[in-house]
Design a protein with these regions (language model features):
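Short amphipathic helical patch at the helix-1/turn junction of helix-turn-helix
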Residues: 85, 119-120
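Conserved GNAT acetyl-CoA-binding A-motif
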Residues: 106-118
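Conserved catalytic-core motifs of GNAT/GCN5-like acyltransferases
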Residues: 115-119, 126, 130, 135-152
């Protein structure tokens, strides 16, 4: 078990956030053309005042991340996306720790609900998030479609905090 703490990402973590996110999201290459994110997007998300990335460092390699997640708050609702764990460390509880950290972060910010969405083609994800208490609350069309290789839509899930 990896005991490194969850912490708030710093601006100098952007390259590693992008690396671990793109590595984890290679599984989406059958419906997304190119990488999941880039440094410009990560910097823009990190700069937003109600947004943050939470990360877990690799205790064996200075400056390397094992996992990251994006979180934001809007009034009484929290939201997270881009949950990413280095494939070599998936199944070790890092995702669970990050989800718990997002929940704690959002509760501290005064949120009463936590939301997420996923692409319907990732058929394993609704059951994964249901294990953490999330329930499907609806669907939505995809916004930016320029990288899509297949038709898809977003599944929206939420849970009370």
């Amino acid at each position: 078990m990896i005991s490194a703490p969850v912490r708030v990402a710093r601006p100098d973590d952007v390259t590693e956030v992008v690396r671990v996110t793109n590595l984890a999201y290679v599984v989406e290459s059958f419906f997304i053309d190119g990488e999941r994110t880039d440094e410009a997007e990560a910097r823009a998300l990190m700069a937003h005042p109600q947004s943050t990335f939470l990360v877990i460092d690799d205790p064996a390699v200075k400056g390397r991340l094992l996992a990251s997640v994006y979180a934001e708050t809007h009034g009484d609702r929290g939201y997270f996306a881009m949950l990413a764990v280095d494939p070599a460390h998936q199944g070790t509880g890092l995702a669970r720790r990050l989800i718990q950290a997002v929940e704690d972060h959002c509760r501290t910010a005064g949120c009463s609900h936590l939301d997420l969405d996923m692409i319907n083609l990732r058929t394993e994800l609704p059951a994964f998030y249901a294990r953490f208490g999330f329930q499907q609350i609806g669907t939505a069309e995809m916004g930016d479609r320029h990288k899509l290789l297949q038709e898809c839509y977003r599944i929206k899930m939420s849970k009370p905090l």
